[in-house]
Amino acid sequence: KTVYEGKHDTLGFTYVDTQNNYNIYENEYFLPMGFAYTEFMTESDFERAYITNQRHSMLCKYIVVPDEKADYYSQFMTRVYPNASKARAGEETYKASVLERREMCCSEFDYSSYGFNAKITLDKPNVVLFSVPYEADGWTATVNGTEREVLRVTYGFVAVECGAGENDIEFS
């Protein structure tokens, strides 16, 4: 039995099996590795808009960027301000946001002990987030063979700028 027993159904988890005394659940709201957003908030705006125990449910709705980089991200997506956000933290917003992210996610993702590769097709230029920890001098990235800056977003994940059309992304 788990601490979460009885709560999985409301979170989109479906019980599958028990093996070796472990309950196995399938998450119908999983996200593939690598996806883009249509809206962003700066770190300070995000912290003002949502109290600590609500923030986790909004991280699929907005990419969160350093305050000083707001102008850069504005060229790719819409900035949302705390008082203008109509999205309410909660389960329904989370589920809807996951479905939105799946519309702009990588079609392929492979990894090795040296890094990872991904492919994504975008209608317009955007930033693609990977839930991989950012390291200041750790990662290098290329998109379609051209070196790109590794961006730190959403409190410590990596992202990279991609163009419209097909993008072959490599992190090493």
Give the role of each language-model region:
Residues E68-S172:
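Active-site-proximal, structured, solvent-exposed surfaces of multi-pass membrane proteins
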Residues K1-L99, D123, N144, N167:
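Extracytoplasmic
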